[in-house]
Every structure is written in C-alpha cells, then in structure tokens.
C-alpha cells in the first residue's frame, strides 16, 4: 500500500529542469539560499536537472557549496572578471536541451537577465511550463511577464 502511493506520486509529479545564472544571482547583495531555492522549486515537481552556471572565476568554496546543495556546478569560460562572459550562452544552450526533452515538463530559470526570453518563448511553444525566479534590482519585466510563473 505504501509502495503503491509512492509509485503514484513518482509517476504523477512533473519533472523539472532548473538552470541558475550564477554570475547574475549568486552575489553577496542577494544572499541566495540554494537550499531554500531547491525546496521552493520542488513545489513544481521532481527536480531531474539542477545546474548552476558559473564563470571560471568561481571559487572552489562556492563550487563545493553548490554541489553540497544537490546542484551541478557548470563552468562556462570566457570574458573578464566582473564583465560579461559566455555563461549566458552556455546556460541557454543547456536550457534548450530541456525544451526538446520529452521527459521534462517544467523549466525553471533563476536569473534577472532578459537574454533568456527566447528560451522561455521556445519552451512555451513546446508545451513546457515555465518559471522564472529573480530578484531586484534589474529583474527583467519582459522575462517575468513571459513566464507562466
């Protein structure tokens, strides 16, 4: 009986892919708690993909903290410290994998950046539920309005 309930829950929960724009939201000014973030996202379903994208300047301590919270640390290269890097491109390409993955139902982007608007639009065109989590200042209004949640 318990096993049947567990099987039912596993089979009916949506599968979620989470992509975190590290350089954009993991900053001292925002004090992002990855554990709390994961718990909030689990309300949308089972997290099957959880990646935090970082640039090559990310400290070992930060990478360790990300991994200990159950996320994969994905390093993108390029750009100068404190300037634009290829992290956005790397994250967008990975998110597009989820858009075309039939096993993913919900795509969550944690960013403030309007550069990810095409990902949200393409995800919705392909029947995915979309969630954007961000913070002020600088949280793109267009991104917020385009997402389902």
Residue ranges of each PLM-predicted region?
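Domain-level signal for Mg2+-assisted phosphodiester chemistry and nucleotide/NA-binding surfaces
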Residues: 1-90, 100, 129, 137-138
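Glycine-rich phosphate-binding loop at the start of an alpha helix
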Residues: 89-92, 117
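Active-site histidine-anchored catalytic micro-motif
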Residues: 101, 105-141, 145
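Receiver (REC) domain switch/active-site residues of two-component response regulators
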Residues: 148-149
């Amino acid at each position: 009986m318990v096993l049947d309930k567990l099987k039912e829950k596993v089979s009916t929960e949506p599968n979620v892919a989470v992509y975190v724009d590290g350089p954009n939201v993991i900053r001292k000014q925002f004090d992002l708690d990855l554990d709390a973030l994961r718990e909030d996202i689990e309300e949308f379903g089972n997290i099957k993909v959880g990646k935090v994208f970082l640039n090559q300047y990310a400290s070992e301590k930060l990478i360790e903290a990300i991994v200990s919270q159950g996320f994969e640390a994905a390093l993108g290269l390029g750009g100068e410290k404190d300037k634009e890097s290829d992290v956005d491109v790397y994250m967008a390409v990975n998110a597009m994998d989820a858009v075309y993955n039939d096993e993913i139902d919900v795509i969550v982007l944690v960013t403030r950046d309007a550069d990810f608007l095409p990902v949200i639009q393409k995800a919705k065109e392909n029947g995915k539920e979309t969630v954007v989590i961000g913070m002020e200042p600088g949280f793109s209004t267009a991104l917020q309005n385009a997402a389902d949640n």
